[in-house]
C-alpha cells in the first residue's frame, strides 16, 4: 500500500493482524464485523476497505507505520529499498552488511549468510578474474564425512519455512523428527488454498480428525519425517525432549526469538545435555537486533527483504507476490546451515548456535542491488519480464498457451515478426520457430497441466498416504551423484511416532512412556475441526 514516503505491506493473515489494523485505523467496529473479520469474506469488500484505509497510509511514513507494528502483535513490513538497507538500524546492529574490496574499489555487500562462530570471514574481497587459478590435479581430495543416514535432526517448526528444512534433508537419509504438541500444533495441518475445501471426493474428512492429515500444504513439506508429540511446557515433557537432544545432532526452530529461552531450551542448556549439539534458529528477523521481536511471514519478508521493491514492471510500484518466496528460501539456507554446523561439530567436537534471519536470507538474493546502491547511490530498477543485459525478453500468446521468449538483441526484428503471427500458431509451433531463428522459448505451464508434461513430470514424486491416497508432490530440487533423492515415506500423522521415538532415541522405558502419556505430557488427540471453526461449505 502506498504511504507518504514509499510503500508498506500490512500483514492480514492472522486474526490478530486484522484486529490491530482496525484499532490503528480508528475503526474498531470492523474487528467483529462478520463480513470483515473472516479473511476470505474480506476479499469481497476490498473497495470499501481501500477507500477507508488509503488516506491513513498516505498521511504516514513507512517507518512510522512500522514502529506501530513493532509496538504490537501486528505483522507488517516496510518495503525496503537497497538504499534503505544501507542505513537500516537492524541490519547494522546485526553486522549483516560490510565493506568488500573489489578491483573497482570498495563496496558494501552482505558479508555472511547467517550468524555463527567464525563468520564473517575476513577480509571480504573480490579477486581479479583469474587471479586465484590453480593447477587441476588428477587425484581429487577426499573428505572424511559422516553418512547422512547417521544424522538426526529435531524439527520444532511450523508452516513452510521451517518444515522445508526437513523436507530437503529427509530424502537424503537424515532422520528428521518433527516435534509437535496439542497447543500449538503445526497450523499448516489446517491450511487449504483459498478456502477450507478438501480434495474432490474427500469433503467428508472435515467431519473428523482426518482433516488434519489431509492438507496438501502440510503433506507437501513434511514427507518422510517422524512425528513426536511432546508438551515441552511441562517439566516432564521438557525432560523427555532433552532425552532426544542427548542422542541427536541438532535442532531447527522457526519460532520468534524469545520462544526457546522461555521454554528453558536456550543453547547453553542444550549444549550441557549434548556438547556437539547444533541449534539453527530462524526467526523472521533473527535472534537479536531492534526488529528481533517483530512478527514476520512471507509477504512481510518480501517487503523487508528487497523483493517487493524489485518485482513488477517499470511503470508499476512495489508489489509482493502470491507465492511467498522467503519461506523456501529460508528453508534452503537453514538446511545448509545445519549441515555446515554438523560438519564443524564433527571436526571440532563442539556444537554451535546458528542465528539465521529470514530477512537477511532474502537480501542474499539482491546482493548486487546493495552493491549498486553503495557505489552509485541509487536503487536498482525493475526488470519486468526482461533478462538483464541487452537481450529481447517477452511473452507471446498462441492458440493454446503463452510462450516465454528470449533472444539476442540482434535477432529482435526476426523474433518480433514471428510473434506477430503467434495467434495463429500453437505454442509448440512458436517454440520451434523461435529456436530455429536462434532464440530460446518455452511453453508457460500451469499447475494443472504441468504434471503431465515432460520433463517436469520427472521432477514430481507420487507419495501414497493412508488418508488421502496417492498424491503428487514437487521432488527434491537437486541430485546427488546423478540421482534425485526421493521421500522415504508420507508426511506423518499426528502423534504417529511418539512412543517409538521416545523409546528408540530417548531410551525411555515402556512404563515411563505410558506414564507420560497418561499424565498428558506426551501424545494426545487434536480437537474436532468444527470446534476450531473449520467447517466445509
Region annotations inferred by a language model:
Residues 305-322:
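The feature captures the short pre-catalytic strand/loop hairpin that immediately precedes
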Residues 154, 203-272:
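A structured beta-alpha segment of the ubiquitous adenosine-cofactor-binding alpha/beta core
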Residues 1-187, 192-206, 271-281, 362-537:
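Acyl-CoA thioester-binding alpha/beta core of soluble enzymes
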Residues 181, 232, 284:
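Active-site loop/turn elements of alpha/beta-hydrolase fold enzymes
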Amino acid at each position: 500500500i502506498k504511504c507518504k514516503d514509499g510503500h508498506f505491506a500490512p500483514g492480514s493473515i492472522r486474526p490478530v493482524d486484522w484486529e490491530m489494523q482496525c484499532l490503528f485505523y480508528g475503526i474498531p467496529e470492523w474487528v467483529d464485523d462478520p463480513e470483515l473479520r473472516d479473511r476470505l469474506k474480506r476479499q469481497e469488500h476490498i473497495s470499501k476497505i481501500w477507500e477507508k484505509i488509503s488516506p491513513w497510509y498516505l498521511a504516514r511514513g513507512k517507518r512510522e507505520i512500522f514502529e506501530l507494528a513493532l509496538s504490537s502483535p501486528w505483522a507488517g513490513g516496510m518495503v525496503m529499498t537497497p538504499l534503505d538497507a544501507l542505513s537500516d538500524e537492524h541490519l547494522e546492529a546485526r553486522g549483516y552488511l560490510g565493506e568488500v574490496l573489489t578491483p573497482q574499489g570498495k563496496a558494501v555487500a552482505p558479508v555472511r549468510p547467517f550468524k555463527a562462530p567464525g563468520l564473517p570471514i575476513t577480509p571480504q574481497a573480490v579477486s581479479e578474474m583469474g587471479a586465484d587459478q590453480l593447477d587441476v590435479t588428477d587425484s581429487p581430495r577426499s573428505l572424511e564425512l559422516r553418512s547422512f543416514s547417521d544424522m538426526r535432526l529435531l524439527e520444532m517448526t511450523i508452516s513452510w519455512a521451517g518444515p522445508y528444512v526437513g523436507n530437503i534433508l529427509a530424502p537424503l537419509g537424515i532422520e528428521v523428527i518433527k516435534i509437535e504438541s496439542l497447543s500449538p500444533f503445526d497450523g499448516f495441518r489446517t491450511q487449504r488454498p483459498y478456502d477450507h475445501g478438501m480434495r474432490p471426493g474427500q469433503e467428508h474428512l472435515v467431519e473428523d480428525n482426518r482433516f488434519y492429515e489431509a492438507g496438501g500444504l502440510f503433506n507437501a513439506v513434511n514427507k518422510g519425517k517422524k512425528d513426536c508429540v511432546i508438551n515441552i511446557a511441562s517439566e516432564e515433557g521438557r525432560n523427555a525432549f532433552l532425552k532426544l537432544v542427548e542422542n541427536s545432532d541438532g535442532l531447527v526452530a522457526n519460532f520468534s526469538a524469545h520462544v526457546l529461552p522461555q521454554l528453558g531450551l536456550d543453547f547453553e542448556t542444550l549444549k550441557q545435555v549434548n556438547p556437539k549439539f547444533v541449534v539453527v534458529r530462524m526467526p523472521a528477523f533473527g535472534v537479536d537486533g531492534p526488529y528481533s521481536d517483530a512478527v514476520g511471514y512471507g509477504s512481510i519478508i518480501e517487503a523487508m527483504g528487497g523483493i517487493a521493491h524489485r518485482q513488477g514492471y517499470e511503470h508499476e510500484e512495489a508489489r509482493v507476490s502470491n507465492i511467498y518466496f522467503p519461506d523456501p528460501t529460508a528453508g534452503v539456507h537453514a538446511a545448509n546451515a545445519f549441515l555446515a554446523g554438523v560438519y564443524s561439530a564433527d571436526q571440532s567436537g563442539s556444537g554451535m548456535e546458528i542465528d539465521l534471519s529470514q530477512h537477511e536470507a532474502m537480501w542474499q538474493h539482491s546482493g548486487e542491488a546493495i552493491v549498486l546502491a553503495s557505489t552509485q547511490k541509487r536503487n536498482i530498477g525493475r526488470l519486468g519480464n526482461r533478462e538483464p543485459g541487452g537481450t529481447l525478453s517477452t511473452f507471446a500468446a498462441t492458440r493454446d498457451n503463452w510462450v516465454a521468449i528470449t533472444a539476442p538483441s540482434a535477432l529482435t526484428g526476426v523474433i518480433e515478426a514471428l510473434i506477430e503471427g503467434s495467434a495463429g500458431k500453437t505454442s509448440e509451433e512458436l517454440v520451434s520457430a523461435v529456436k530455429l531463428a536462434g532464440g530460446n522459448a518455452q511453453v508457460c505451464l500451469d499447475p494443472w497441466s504441468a504434471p503431465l508434461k515432460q520433463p517436469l513430470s520427472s521432477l514430481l514424486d507420487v507419495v501414497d498416504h493412508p488418508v488421502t491416497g496417492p498424491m503428487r508432490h514437487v521432488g527434491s530440487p537437486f541430485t546427488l551423484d546423478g540421482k534425485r533423492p526421493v521421500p522415504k515415506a508420507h508426511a506423518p500423522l499426528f502423534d504417529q511416532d511418539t512412543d517409538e521415538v521416545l523409546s528408540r532415541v530417548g531410551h525411555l522405558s515402556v512404563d515411563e512412556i505410558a506414564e507420560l502419556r497418561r499424565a498428558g505430557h506426551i501424545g494426545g488427540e487434536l480437537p474436532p475441526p468444527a470446534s476450531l471453526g473449520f467447517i466445509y461449505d
